[in-house]
Each structure stands twice: as C-alpha cells, then as structure tokens.
Curated annotation (Swiss-Prot):
Changing residue 52 to A: Loss of alkalinization activity. GO terms for biological process: defense response. The lineage of its organism: Eukaryota, Viridiplantae, Streptophyta, Embryophyta, Tracheophyta. Residues 43-52 have a biased composition (Basic and acidic residues). Keywords: Plant defense. Expressed in roots. Barely detected in flowers. It comes from Glycine max. Residues 31-41 have a biased composition (Polar residues). This is Protein PROPEP914. The keyword Electron transport does not apply. Induction: Up-regulated by the GmPep914 peptide, ethephon, methyl jasmonate and methyl salicylate. Residues 25-52 are annotated as: Disordered.
C-alpha cells in the first residue's frame, strides 16, 4: 500500500514539477527518467493489480 501511495505521490509531484520547471528547461532529459521508473513499478505491481 505504501509503495502504491508513494508512486502516486511521485507521479503527481513529477507532473507538477515538469509543468513548472522541466517542461521549459529540458523535457527530453526528464522524460526518460520518469517513464523509466514508472514502467518498472507498473511492471512489478502488474500481477498484483492490473488496474495500476
């Protein structure tokens, strides 16, 4: 449960930060990092819950 919540918070924070700073600074450099960890977490929690 904590991992899911942390993941959700990270996603929300990442979106906000991207819109505020990284979007204008360097979106290409930030983009690969966020989806990378996102894919890893989703892949790990996929068997437990396909919804996430």
């Amino acid at each position: 449960m904590v991992k899911c919540f942390d993941f959700f918070l990270s996603l929300n924070f990442g979106k906000m930060t991207k819109l505020l700073v990284w979007r204008t600074d360097k979106p290409q450099d930030d983009m690969p990092q966020t989806p990378n960890s996102q894919v890893t977490i989703v892949s790990r929690d996929h068997p437990r819950g396909g919804n996430y």
